[in-house]
Amino acid sequence: MNNKTIKAVEKRILRNMMADEKELRVLLETETNGVPDRQLDGLFVKIEQLLARISNNQNKIILLQDLKDE
């Protein structure tokens, strides 16, 4: 395994995760002022998309680490 390549990919994934987490925090702090949930569907979808991307990136890092350890 090329450890340099693995490290570079891990760093890239981590940068993406940090950006997604920052965006997620902004969305989670959005003031909805009692707006009904059915009107916030777009916000909820975006939050779920960011959560899925973060989770997917976590899985990628775990897989890379497992491959490196073999």
Q: Could you say what each language-model-derived stretch is?
A:
Residues R12, N16-E70:
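Short, charge-rich amphipathic interface segments used for partner binding and complex assembly
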Residues N2-K7:
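Long, low-complexity or tandemly repetitive, helically biased scaffold regions used
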